[in-house]
Amino acid sequence: MTERLVIIGGCAAGMSAASKARRTDPDLDILVYEKTGFVAYGACGMPYYVSGLVQDHNTLVVRTPEQFARQEIKVHLHHEVTGIDAARCRVRVSDLESGETREEACDKLVIATGGRSAIPAGAPGFSPGELQGVFTLRALEDGIAIREFIQREKPRRAVIVGAGYIGLEMAESFRVLGLETTVIGRPPQMLKRFDPEMAQFMQGALEDEGVRLSLGDEAKALEGDSQGRVRQVVSSSGAFEADLVLLALSVLPNVALAEAAGVALGETGAIATDAGMRTNLPNVFAAGDCAEAYHRVIGRGAYIPLGTTANKQGRVMGTNAGGGQATFKGIVGTTITKAFDTYAALTGLAEKEARALGYEVKSTTIKARSRAHYYPGSAPMHVRLVVQEGSGRLLGGQIIGDEGAGLRINVLAGALHSDMTVEQLSQLDLAYMPPMSPVWDPLLVAANVALKG
């Protein structure tokens, strides 16, 4: 008898799981329920669609429901799963267009419900739909709505509430479009995973491009005019005029559905899984922004929601849901973002994070050049290494600079994945040519300075 796999959520983890499950078991009956109008799209490309760098939102879509149908993967758009009966392995599904509700049986269940934007409870003006011109950016439909609003209403002043990756990238998008842009962040720095000494370089890059930063500040209320259009953001430091507000606060795991069904959560509040992406319930899997990921540096689950992790976890989950055998080897927390010509990359632990976890550490920060000093385009690059005292074990790294930051952070990610010491890092045989690096790569310079320290 043919088994049925039901997948809740059609973005990175869900559709990676669907595709891999199909390749693992050609006979599996696969149903995907997605409450929005799109599946399998590059969510990280949305800021560039808003700015106009990417002209057509359809180019962000990797595969359409029709393409999945050719693999015999049935995708149901605008369908929301509102309940899970794990004991009977059934889900309650609501058709958001017709209003009809039905039950669907399954043999195995994948939960890929993703993350949700953190919205301050009870704060005036923050509730969805309360004021025109207030947006979040999680789904592709959000990006489309923001771009259409800008084209239709031609706002002059944008305020971004939140100073993380989305806030930073959207600040660039709004400035590219000519909007006066303010970023309000509750922490005293942008990019809170970074050490303050490194975050300041990115903050300077934004201010150089005309972005106003109000850090160590908290948005308290959004106020509108008589027609219900947002007009200002009231914060603990004052008021900021706004025609457009983007709420880019923390991403939280979307786990209410899973938790109600008895799925266990980890210490982070996201779904806990084993290395095969199995939950505590039989035949129920979870992956992506709703789930924890094993962090190789700290040796336990962490919540660092990223598309790269979601795709890898989804692939493992799909293999196992399809009857195969696969394990997720873990993350080291590698991220990168960009604003204008400055890139900020991080892997592993920042010094402040390592100390909070009880590690005794020393940090080394150096300034080098991204290319040979005489080669056109050579630019400053700041590298920070975090090393465990005594053992010399590499715990993390941060790089601020030009596009070369991305290439180098991947070297550090590999070093962390392999549990290398800073001495071993210093001995790596890295490529050299003047257009790409100095003869002493900034990573090697930083490692050698750390060894002296």
Indicate where each model-derived feature is located:
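Beta1-alpha1 glycine-rich phosphate/pyrophosphate-binding loop at the start
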Residues: T2-K74, H78, A171-F194
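Flexible, glycine-rich terminal cap/loop adjacent to redox cofactors
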Residues: I8-A12, R22-D27, K35-T36, F340-T347, ...
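Residue-level detector of alpha-helix initiation sites
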Residues: C11-M15, G37, G115-S117, E141, ...
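A Rossmann-like FAD-binding core segment of flavoenzymes
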Residues: D27-D29, E72-E97, E104, V176-A275
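Rossmann-like dinucleotide-binding cores of NAD(P)H-dependent redox enzymes
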Residues: L60-V61, R157-V159, Y165-E223, P305-A310, ...
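Glycine-rich dinucleotide-binding loop and its adjacent helix/turn
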Residues: T113-L177, R212, T273-A275
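FAD-site-proximal beta/loop scaffold in flavoenzymes
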Residues: G129-R152, S226-Q232, A239-T319, V411, ...
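A conserved FAD-binding loop/helix module that cradles the flavin
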Residues: T273, A287-A350, M436-G453
